[in-house]
């Protein structure tokens, strides 16, 4: 048997090139004294800034944080170490002292040759390693070249920087002179000559500045409204004001103009005292304007912004804080804002989570509460109370001991702040629900004493008795508003709504409902009937809400556009051209009716408000009329005008509405069934069980629980096939292609009462074939 040859022993000193390279790199790192792992005391910790409003920190004060490190746990002793994450410089996580201790050789780093080297003694210690003579000469020449290049480059940079700075100073000086002497600019004179503004001599009695008068002239506001004429002088004198005026009377500029006047006065004082302009981050707002809805906040910003854009020398910045938009962007806008406009929820969210923002807001000169009855009503807008409390709160230790009484008065946030309150309704009795069997009062809705007491309890006014300015003590509604009521059956509201819309072609119409589901259904119903309908409710995304308002208010849009909305559109929206307001559901409270109807007949224009009233809503409508028109001289039980629709028209359009309702209900039922099915399927997947829709429907139908009949009806409506839906749509399309015949022979048009010439020209109401009497209020 042959003996196996013995293998040579492996030389352990031989390693692969790759391993040698890694070991050399590790050795180099260890030689440098830096392995990237440090203790907690050597890190550059940063203190955590706590928000201004923190209810309970639980003892966590003085917290510190650091970013860009990984935790390295020790092998045996449990000690925790840290190291920089990949891609982050290791020096950035260390303290300066720790950095010097870890890298002492950085202090003696070679920085090139200098003239001091010649004077140094021969035996002096030097960290420069001696090189051969040839390499010294090369390095010397190279360093001289680099030094010359660097000097030339630095000289060029300095020259460019100086020229840029000089140019910037010249530009800022020119801009400053132009802003101060804006009225003397020839370009401004040329612009005013080209654009002839309105005559603003009627504003002279209010004592406004030339800049504001110029802006009002460009905006074509020739004379102030009654509420502006009454409120602006009182606000300019420094009084707290409670303004009560009908909707569409110009309340926005009644408080917007005094705020801008204060801004201009402050700007003049800064220029006369030759103060340096503060940076945006150091500036403090002069006014906070609170609004109950996002749409109203956007509108306030738009109206005040228009006056700022038209008034020369007024560069006030507006920060708009509303929900549905980026919080980070709004925080940046707030840092340099002069006027803050927002809804209570978002304003309080930003103030409570920020650092130093509440202290900034305590220095405002104006607090404006628009639509105050809604913002200050019980059970709504808890954030308003938080905002008001934070503005009036004086923290302990702010006024040091030994200060006199004057300094304590100056430290009171409300001592220098004017409070301005505006709305069309203040009486609390208007906020009671109209429906139900509870006892209701026939009180005067314009009771001044109750309104004053109610507001004095909620708000901290600077004066004991603020100025109460009531511009409509007799009638709560606008003068040019016509009110009417249409009585119908409980299941005929869709039919009468469509008929009312046919009676008012080329009218911009706003339809109010009491629920979001009704908005969705009515929008689809009217779109199925080929009417330009848009939706607006609180569940929509903010961008979609703004898009609906923009499309509805755009002058280039269809004049027959219809906006179906909940009460989010009831307050403050100033949309030009709204001719008709329809209450699909009777309003729950009287103040809601006042604000809904106030969307039309604004600024002296005429408008109509119609309630579609079912049998179950009649009691509430009677109470509504009694509250709103309590001071009417005629003493009628129901002062609303009863409107009678032509029964021929109602019967002719009924097939259209029936077909459209079937199509709409089928589509909604299909969407709802699909959504529920998807939810159940996802829930079954999460639970890890098998989902069978048919088995689930069988088990669901066996019970006798609540909603069983509704689910069964929904399933039946949603079971309509696509072919059946297509047939219904084709039938509806044929009906919509024809005019509604109101008793005219289509074969012998000339024999009837039809105006053929007007028919060919497309004049009159093109929805009907034949004469139809308009609705008389």
From Swiss-Prot:
Region spans: Disordered: 1-38, 92-176, 392-417, 692-720
Reaction equations catalysed: ATP + H2O = ADP + phosphate + H(+)
UniProt-recorded Gene Ontology molecular function terms: ATP binding; ATP hydrolysis activity; RNA binding; RNA helicase activity
A cellular component term, taken from the record's GO annotations: nucleolus
Localisation: Nucleus, Nucleolus
Motif range (Q motif): 201-229
Motif (DEAD box): 370-373
Ranges for domain Helicase ATP-binding: 232-444
Binding sites annotated in the UniProt record for ATP: 245-252
Pfam family of the protein (one): DEAD
Span of domain Helicase C-terminal: 496-646
Compositional bias ranges of the Basic and acidic residues kind: 1-10, 130-171
Spans traversing the lipid bilayer: none
UniProt function note: ATP-binding RNA helicase involved in the biogenesis of 60S ribosomal subunits and is required for the normal formation of 25S and 5.8S rRNAs.
Comment, domains: The Q motif is unique to and characteristic of the DEAD box family of RNA helicases and controls ATP binding and hydrolysis.
Descriptive protein name: ATP-dependent RNA helicase mak5
